[in-house]
Amino acid sequence: MNVKGKAILSMLVASTVIVVFWEYINSSEGSFLWIYHSKNPEVGDVRAPMGWWFPSWFNNGTHIYQEEEEDVDKEKGRKKEQREKDDREELQLWDWFTPEKRPEVVTVTSWKAPVVWEGTYNSAILENYYAKQKITVGLTVFAIGKYLEYYLEEFIASADRYFMVGHKVIFYIMVNNVSRMPPLELGPLRSFEVFEIKAEKRWQDVSMMRMKIIGEHILTHIQHEVDFLFCMDVDQVFQDNFGVETLGESVAQLQAWWYKADPNEFTYERREKSAAYIPFGQGDFYYHAAIFGGTPIRVLNITQECFKGILQDKKNDIEANWHDESHLNKYFLVNKPSKILSPEYCWDYQIGLPSDIKIVKISWQTKEYHLVRNNV
């Protein structure tokens, strides 16, 4: 075959191949097999398979990725909502309180309030709950006259060590002479505020007037600064952790000398003329005014009602046997406390140490009345 014949043959073969290829790719079976196994059913252009596959893959991939992101976000949202719900939910008594662990003592009152003894509470559950709340606890203390020099420094030092460890605390210190304040060094999360008040001529009046003063400070600033507030006598010392197990709406302290006595033996005010009067046959416990507390609003109510009774007695020319403590007992008889602290939280070692006192949280200081009760 000559050169011209070969050229013609080559052209025929090439034309045949082109025609066959063109028919194939436009047939129902033709495709770019390495990209997609069938033609785009909507687009007849040979470029359609590639043009459809790339954006479709990208868009589908993005859609799946977005769905995964949305699922993750929804799960995070659900967990956050659950955490916020847990934070808002009130801690239930039986979540942390096990009264049957102390069968030898009274652990629940007739009105179902807990009496907190060592061994009846779960510290871990309580700490976890209150840590989430980010609480601040206030503590008022009065150091008037010689009480300042004899007791204040040790009281604050021991409170700094044992009172509400790990939580923010504000000490409200009431003195009649700021210049005699000892230097105070406090740990992290602790601060103090000092207020100068008038010294009364009688220690009884100092004791009773504190109700008025505490109420005034709650109204002007304390209610905006703390979540819970305790009011304590200065002539005692912390010896072990006084923690969040003591927190409640209204908290009363059992008096160490009377916690086993019959109510008819209590030294309640028995004279009908007094606003603090409690007749024989009535009464639940004898409460110690050395420690009481609760939410600021409830403590405000306690102090206002007690001071109202004190003023009524003054008007009627009578003074309750145990002054503000008598009025406090009358208040808690009418307005039952939501939580009671066992004598372990305010113990007098002169009683000894009976078997039901497992650990002493606060102890009374030696009462040097002949030295400290002259406040002039």
Curated annotation (Swiss-Prot):
Instruction: Please classify the protein's predominant subcellular localization into one broad category.
Output: Golgi
GO molecular function ontology, one term from the record: metal ion binding
Q: How does it sit in the membrane?
A: Single-pass type II membrane protein
> Which residues does the annotation flag as glycosylated?
N60, N301
* Cofactor(s) of this protein: Mn(2+)
Q: Which residues lie on this side of the membrane: Lumenal?
A: 26-376
Query: What is the enzyme's main class?
Result: transferase
Q: Which family does it belong to?
A: Belongs to the glycosyltransferase 6 family.
What is the annotated role of this protein in its UniProt record?
Synthesizes the galactose-alpha(1,3)-galactose group by catalyzing the transfer of a galactose residue, with an alpha-1,3 linkage, on terminal lactosaminide (Gal-beta-1,4-GlcNAc-R) disaccharide borne by a glycoprotein or a glycolipid. Preferentially glycosylates proteins, can synthesize galactose-alpha(1,3)-galactose on glycoproteins but cannot synthesize the glycolipid called isogloboside 3 (iGb3).
PANTHER family, sorted: GLYCOSYLTRANSFERASE-RELATED, N-ACETYLLACTOSAMINIDE ALPHA-1,3-GALACTOSYLTRANSFERASE
Name recorded for this polypeptide: N-acetyllactosaminide alpha-1,3-galactosyltransferase
Organism source for this protein?
A: Loris tardigradus
